[in-house]
């Protein structure tokens, strides 16, 4: 499983961060698990009023992330699922989403947690969705990474915190 070697992140003083979660709608069962994991992580971090927005698919995540980054959010979490099919569509969507979300983060300075599953099968996606029987919870992990990065950025600009 890919979770080997994952860091234990300690995040403090983040309850006042403005966080948005953007979730694609394809593969409903997987997405429900990712969203639940993300919202649970936010609650554990003391962020009880995040913005949750839905988009049709993963390819639409970057444009919404870009708009939100310009609206004062401290961190954005992008959740989606792309499952390989029999055409190159999978490769194009995965590359576009990954590059788009990276560009948003680098261009705006707003961390974007990458919770987009790129899997060969639905079973692989379910195993990472944070639902009962899953081995990983990528929604939770994406929130933790985004909020930890936002806290790091805040410590650089506000070292007295």
From Swiss-Prot:
Protein name stated in the entry: 6,7-dimethyl-8-ribityllumazine synthase
Residues bound to (2S)-2-hydroxy-3-oxobutyl phosphate: 86-87, 128
Entry's Gene Ontology molecular function annotations: 6,7-dimethyl-8-ribityllumazine synthase activity
Superkingdom of this protein's organism: Bacteria
Similarity comment: family membership: Belongs to the DMRL synthase family.
Pathway: Cofactor biosynthesis; riboflavin biosynthesis; riboflavin from 2-hydroxy-3-oxobutyl phosphate and 5-amino-6-(D-ribitylamino)uracil: step 1/2
Any one Gene Ontology BP term: riboflavin biosynthetic process
EC number(s) stated in the UniProt entry for this protein: 2.5.1.78
């Amino acid at each position: 499983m890919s979770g080997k070697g994952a860091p234990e992140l300690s995040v403090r003083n983040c309850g006042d961060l403005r966080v948005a979660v953007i979730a694609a709608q394809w593969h409903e069962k997987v997405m429900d698990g990712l969203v639940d994991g993300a919202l649970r992580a936010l609650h554990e971090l003391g962020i009880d009023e995040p913005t949750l927005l839905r988009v049709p698919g993963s390819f639409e995540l970057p444009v919404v992330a870009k708009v939100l980054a310009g609206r004062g959010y401290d961190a954005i979490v992008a959740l989606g699922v792309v499952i390989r099919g029999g055409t190159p569509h999978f490769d194009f969507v995965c590359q576009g989403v990954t590059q788009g979300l990276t560009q948003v983060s680098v261009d705006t300075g707003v961390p974007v947690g990458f919770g987009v599953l790129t899997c060969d099968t639905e079973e692989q996606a379910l195993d990472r969705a944070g639902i009962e029987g899953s081995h990983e919870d990528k929604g939770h992990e994406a929130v933790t990474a985004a909020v930890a990065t936002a806290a790091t950025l805040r410590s650089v600009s506000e070292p007295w915190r």
